[in-house]
From Swiss-Prot:
The chain crosses the membrane at residues 10-30, 40-60, 68-88, 94-114, 135-155. The gene is lspA. The active site is at 124, 143. It is found in: Cell inner membrane. It is a multi-pass membrane protein. It comes from the Bacteria. Belongs to the peptidase A8 family. It comes from Pseudomonas aeruginosa (strain UCBPP-PA14). GO terms for molecular function: aspartic-type endopeptidase activity. This is Lipoprotein signal peptidase. This protein specifically catalyzes the removal of signal peptides from prolipoproteins. GO terms for biological process: proteolysis. NCBIfam families: lspA (TIGR00077).
Length: 169
């Protein structure tokens, strides 16, 4: 990776771009193929494709509000994204695990931010459920990238705290 010292770990932004592109392509595909709330069962009693629009935050938090939440969540995503870019830029060469985690979170945040700004809602299409009795809120690839990145960040902090020094690499 050229000029890592000058650009920190910014070369890892290719992961951010990949997450963003795959997220947007998958959302476009499911919007073209499914009608609202239509389900295509992939694994009976466990996993389906569906189409849902979320005007709130994760797990539809504040989805029933009057619309102000769109701008609040967009502002939060912009601020968090800027912080993540600065954090990525300041990482040292051996902090690969952390760079990947931050790039995943950033890609997911930007994917959902794009939806929120352009469409006014986030497009969700993955539905995990159990025998028509329990349904996890629908989500998308951006949400998945944010979750994986956040778990990686938590593991990184746990490993760092346990050993007493940064556990990157």
């Amino acid at each position: 990776m050229p000029e890592v010292d000058r650009f920190g770990r910014l070369p890892w932004l290719w992961i951010t771009v990949l997450v963003f592109v795959l997220d947007q392509l998958s959302k476009a595909f499911f919007q073209a193929e499914l009608s609202m709330y239509q389900q295509i069962v992939v694994i009976p009693d466990l996993f389906s494709w569906t189409l849902a629009y979320n005007t709130g935050a994760a797990f539809s938090f504040l989805a029933d509000s009057s619309g102000w939440q769109r701008w609040l969540f967009a502002l939060i995503a912009i601020v968090v994204s800027a912080i993540l870019v600065v954090w990525l830029k300041r990482l040292k060469k051996g902090e690969t695990w952390l760079a990947i985690a931050l790039a995943l979170v950033l890609g997911g945040a930007l994917g959902n931010l794009y939806d929120r700004m352009v469409l006014g809602h986030v497009v969700d299409f993955i539905l995990v459920h159990w025998q028509n009795r329990w349904y996890f809120p629908a989500f998308n690839l951006a949400d998945s990238a944010i979750t994986v990145g956040a778990v990686m960040l938590a593991l990184d902090m746990f490993r760092s705290k346990k050993s007493g020094e940064a556990a990157h690499g």
